[in-house]
Amino acid sequence: MKNINPMKTHAWKKLQNHFFDVKNIYIKDFFCLDKNRFANFSVFFKDFMLIDFSKNRISSQTLKLLFQLAQECYLDDAIKNMFLGKIINKTENRPVLHVALRNRLNNKIILNNIDIMNEIQIELKKIKCFSESIIDGSWKGFTGKSISDVVNIGIGGSYLGPYMITEALKIYKNHLNIHYISNIDGTEISEVLKKINLETTIFLIASKSFSTDETISNANYLKKWCILKTNYKKYFSKHFFALCENIKTAINFGIKYENIFKFWDWVGGRYSLWSSSGLSIVLSIGFKNFESLLYGAYLMDQHFLHTKISKNIPIILALISIWYTNFFNTETEAIFPYDKYLHVLPEYLQQSYMESNGKSIDRNGKLVTWNTCPIIWGSTGTNGQHSFFQLLHQGTTMVPCDFIIPAISHNLINDHHKKLLSNFLAQTASLAFGNINKDIMNMNLKYSSENFIFSHKTYFGNKPSNSIFLKKITPISLGSLIALYEHKIFVQGVILNIFSFDQWGVELGKTVANNIYNNLFKKKKINVYDCSTIGLINLYKYWNRI
């Protein structure tokens, strides 16, 4: 990829001038100027998704300049390089090929003179055979009973992706109970162990390196606990499986080779749900539905790769986000799925965005002088309306939002979904248009009890949002939605000249934590850290009588 400072492009300078021309224009004015704004500022994807970006503080000229910015940053070349398997993760010297995992036409993808699609197909067949044997009951535990429960042990991408998908597609769930242990917190393990029968439970240890401290600490405890409780040394070989790249370490841990489902170093952790790391997804919804999930992502991949920039959904949404973070200086973006099945989506996207683009060093190794990644947060609607929407409507901070809803609900109870949709539409309209006209906004009303109350009930509007309208939540539509966000994040990283596929920012905390951990066992008082950390460590020891 080209290492271009975006602020030095011609488009960026034009955008700065353009910003001063449009910053005081209200969204309602854009609609008045263009009676076809909805049609002109929305894109259909296949027959199951519509992205409406008309309620943004942008004009056609804004988009034109943003497209020019993308071209000056050689975005098209970067996209092609990712799909071709070029090394774009420079700090780890790796290609980035999660798109290969959902290459449903099985086109050749050559890496180091090897067609990696052959390896992917072999692993998919293994996943298919294993998952079907668990689901149909032919796989037996150590006492000859079929499996009823699956425990996925993993953190970060080895947890958030699979958990988000299994929740989102719960309507497709079979009889198996899926549990997740992610945190290194004894409470989490204890609560899961209360729910399972060891005779009918399998454990999936999901860690790319098979060395993640939280995951391996939890796996070690469960390994010893299960053998102790069952008094059967062979329990481990019948009930424990590894999802990893580091096969040697998994074998040394005690996992049988045939119980290892592998993925590769060119699959980033937060993109690993498409790989064997998503085995818990397959066990929850079945292999055919998992294939549909992959197909949905593949459809978005093809759209991203082949669609012209003016109709390319991930590119458009990425550029609008850059417009807000760097010209309006917004600091957060919110994700609001109006469907309970998508309740984990904001947390999942929080990791996807912030671990990918939460960087302050550019691809030239220099400190950036522009904004990179907003803070991502969100909640399901309508719960959020009764929590923090007050700030969105009347606060001093502008928060660009994505609203997501299916037109067809899986659970038709009375007129609930119509009411849910009404709230969805009301929020996007109210945020955009408010409830008063510009003349009243600019008036200095004389004090009266009536005016006093009126001022507190005003909604100025002009708060931007995107509406993502799904026909229905299915494996295909969900796959497309997740891939859309993946590519949006990639586009932002390319244009903002940062590396989106590493996460060095998490390493320092791990190193310091290991050092502190070793000192927690020493009886003498600690004085090798700052006074705050020392005080907290010594109080911990006092309360625990160490």
UniProtKB/Swiss-Prot annotation:
Q: Name one GO biological process term.
A: gluconeogenesis
Which keywords accompany this UniProt record?
Cytoplasm, Gluconeogenesis, Glycolysis, Isomerase
Which reaction is catalysed here? Answer: alpha-D-glucose 6-phosphate = beta-D-fructose 6-phosphate
| GO MF terms held by the record | carbohydrate derivative binding; glucose-6-phosphate isomerase activity; monosaccharide binding
Q: EC number(s) per UniProt?
A: 5.3.1.9
GO cellular component terms attached to this protein's record? cytosol
**Stored InterPro entries:** G6P_Isomerase, G6P_Isomerase_C, Phosphoglucose_isomerase_CS, SIS_dom_sf, SIS_PGI_1, SIS_PGI_2
Domain of life of the organism encoding this protein: Bacteria
Compartment annotation = Cytoplasm
Annotated pathway, please? Carbohydrate biosynthesis; gluconeogenesis; Carbohydrate degradation; glycolysis; D-glyceraldehyde 3-phosphate and glycerone phosphate from D-glucose: step 2/4
- Which residues are the active-site ones? 355 (proton donor), 386, 510
The record's family statement is: Belongs to the GPI family.
NCBIfam families in the record, alphabetically? Answer: PRK00179.1
What does the protein in this record do?
Catalyzes the reversible isomerization of glucose-6-phosphate to fructose-6-phosphate.
Stated name of the protein: Glucose-6-phosphate isomerase
Species assigned in the record: Buchnera aphidicola subsp. Cinara cedri (strain Cc)
